[in-house]
Amino acid sequence: MARIAGINVPVKKCVPFALTYIHGIGITTANIICRSCKIDERKRVLELQDEDIEKISSFIRQKYVIEGELRKKVAMDIKSLMEIGCYRGLRHRKGLPVRGQRTHTNAKTRKGRSKLPIAGKK
């Protein structure tokens, strides 16, 4: 495993796919990073030189919010929505779908399992 931006990425995969193992970087962003650092997208992580890995790491640290920072930012955004009392914040607080999906028959995952009483032995 190679470390890019403090995250272990698989060495046998091509660089863009390996970069997607970092939380906050998808395939499109990974391709942009490869083009910006002038690294062939078909190259595997194993074939990269140390300076290439350092170039990618520094580029990611400068341009993108990743991993723990990103998780913290998303959590703070949701918390602020709940504090100001907007509709999306209320939906988050109640544990319901936020983006307008129907809840009458769907949304089982977001609402959780229903708590039915279990009948005892008669």
Swiss-Prot record:
UniProt feature coiled coil, ranges: none
Biological process (GO), any one: translation
Domain of life according to the entry: Bacteria
Record's GO cellular component terms: cytosol; small ribosomal subunit
Keyword Ribosomal protein: yes
Lipid metabolism as UniProt keyword: no
Keywords: Ribonucleoprotein, Ribosomal protein, RNA-binding, rRNA-binding, tRNA-binding
GO molecular function: rRNA binding; structural constituent of ribosome; tRNA binding
One Pfam family in the UniProt entry: Ribosomal_S13
Disordered, as annotated region: 97-122
InterPro entries: Rbsml_uS13_C, Ribosomal_uS13, Ribosomal_uS13-like_H2TH, Ribosomal_uS13_bac-type, Ribosomal_uS13_CS
Functional summary from the UniProt entry: Located at the top of the head of the 30S subunit, it contacts several helices of the 16S rRNA. In the 70S ribosome it contacts the 23S rRNA (bridge B1a) and protein L5 of the 50S subunit (bridge B1b), connecting the 2 subunits; these bridges are implicated in subunit movement. Contacts the tRNAs in the A and P-sites.
Subunit structure comment from the entry: Part of the 30S ribosomal subunit. Forms a loose heterodimer with protein S19. Forms two bridges to the 50S subunit in the 70S ribosome.
Family: Belongs to the universal ribosomal protein uS13 family.
Protein name according to UniProt: Small ribosomal subunit protein uS13
Source species: Wolbachia pipientis subsp. Culex pipiens (strain wPip)
Gene behind this protein: rpsM
